[in-house]
Amino acid sequence: MLSPTQKRASLLASGAAVAGLLISSLAAGGVSYAADNESCRPDGLYKTPGVDVPYCSVYDTEGREKMGADHQRRVIGYFTSWRTGKNGQPAYLAKDIPWDKITHVNYAFGHVGGDNKLSVGADGPDNASTGMTWPGVAGAEMDPEFPYKGHFNQLNKFKKQHPNVRTLISVGGWAETGGYFDDNGDRVNSGGFYSMATNADGSVNQAGIDTFANSAVDFIRKYGFNGVDIDYEYPTTMKDAGNPLDWQVANARRAGLVKGYAALMKSLREKLDRAGAADGRHYLLTVAAPSSGYLLRGMETFQVQKYLDYVNIMSYDLHGAWNEYVGPNASLFDDGKDGELAAANVYGSAQYGNIGYLNTDWAYHYFRGSMPSGRINIGLPYYTRGHKNVQGGTDGLWGKAAATSCPAGAGLTKCGDGAVGIDNLWHDKDTNGQESPAGSNPMWHAKNLEKGIVGDYVTQYGFPANTTLTGTYARKYDSTLVAPWLWNAQKKVFLSTEDEQSVAAKADYVVDRGIGGTMIWELAGDYGWNAAKGQYEMGDTLTSLMYDKFKAATPYGAKKSNKALPTQAVNVGVEFTEFKLGDSNYPITPKIKITNNTATALPGGTEFQFDYGTSAPSNASDQSGFGTKVISSDHTGSNVGGLKGDFHRVSLKLPAWQSLAPGASVDLAFNYYLPVSTPSNWTVNINGTTYALAGDLARGTTTVEPGTTTPPTTPPTTEPTTPPTTPPTTPPTTPPTTPPTGCTAPAYVAGQVYNGGSLVSHKGHTWKAQWWTQNEEPGTTGEWGVWKDQGAC
């Protein structure tokens, strides 16, 4: 049985398959309206139509998250449910979290139940989340204010002491994406995310999604969470991706997984927004996203990013014992020597631009193409991965270690030779109940190995008290990769690690590039020195280091574009469609569908421009006569030591003979070679005037009809940000010539249209419209309605 601890485990099928470009939809957005909460909305974040989302409860007026004066960047820690200490192994409880050093806690994990509802299992004294207690453990006393016990009681107890820290319920993970563990610890292969979001025929299971999303709202309200983190591993079209136990249900649905994922995230965003408006607090929606170019190749352009407050990149598990290629678990940069990529001739194939895609920097730039840097967090592993019997390489790095067989249930016919025994303390078990070779250890154990120390905890993991170490675990470090490792030359064991040097470099990288922060899997892996015992144990050394790096940092980047864009936008929709599936998705020529949702014809020769991320080389082209070309690039050449900039700027034009009438669409075929997320920062030049596109959801833009400065006379056809309402066919009542005595704003007139930001006087008060409105009397719409009371006048 695969245990719950096999969370973000091997990518298994990540292999050396070369990724192809995947680009997805940029649907036309709606009119932007001036409103107090709108001033706090993060750039590019989708807003639920008709809802005054209380963004200002979480974000400042620049759209940056408010986390406390000494937290300029995020430090997000995953806190796992299973390290309770009840099995005799070291416990990691809520009291052990360095609450003053972090900004968010993601609780791992909730799951999708057989009824499609969010669950952590049945209540009871053995339920770690809601029922367990720790009598006699100092700091783990239950808070009687809460009607539940367990970790949830403890998390809320400490949140009262640290009100700036936000908690999210993380749902899924490696072991519970396609099923869940019942109260007996047996896995139920229910289908999980796969069947909840996608029907067997590949269509969207909206009923299942609605059930889950409604239950998620109920769950966070009941247990005091600040949001939901979706850890769906993985909604990709790549065959045999994810947990082998899920392949039967997942593979049958591959063609519809991306669409189901998008529907799930949109529904969650909208239901959380409505709940937040009712509760007066903005609820966060985040995901744990893959970093592998192989997996992302099957996820189109990760078009769900617009629904997310931020994305946490799982920028680890980039190398491990699922194959023979020995390399870092989570290198920051490429060095041009990655054994897995070299075997696939990635470096030798011109179309890939000499770009290596198994590193944190590549993954960051993939998401940077569609999101502000501040809505991205890079992942750091507080655990090791490694091989034994390594042949070749430099101190094991870029060597090979092939196994003669694979663990039961791995679903593979060829595997790497993973480290075992004392080099695999945090191992999972295969489906036969045997140790799964992986070289998986908490960093506190790896530090003891490095120092030649056998910690007294080894007996709690089944080792005898007189255990001795064989050979020396020499620390090695590659400054180009920003990657440390331990090399035992006698045992030929390679263990990829993290320590102060690598974490400091990654923290500097975050600060220098305006990135939102870091995400940690998992908090219990951090280390501290116990001088009394002469050994490393669970601690907060690395987390404290990041806190110190971030506390005085400059504010993170809050804008998608690095250049000024037009403040007027038009409703021209751009959608990316017709992706091939799985391994057929390379090379890729998706169709780009441009739809004119304005009332003005777009003449032949109309130019569109957009940015795509430097995760792909600057060789974009089209096959439809639109003259697509890259007109500027922030990066060229290899990415050894990191990509040097964020975007490639692309130009394409309607053919001179082809105009685009109102309501009409045109398709063109694109060609790319490495994955990018949804292209952004679109502009269109119509009759000499350059506009933004409403679908980019940029802050500070107003949607207008081309050639005017006024909003369209009819609502947009896709994703309006306000309720669609047709203006009256008869003139409104003529307003009074003077407002009521003492009031300076015009008097409210029933039937008149008011745009967001409009001020009126009514019944002795001044009122401000939060969005477009008509026939809604001030004072009757409630606290979260369209009219906000500005005080007596």
Question: What does each of the following model-derived ranges do?
Answer:
Residues 117-142, 235-435:
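Substrate-binding surface in catalytic domains of secreted glycosidases
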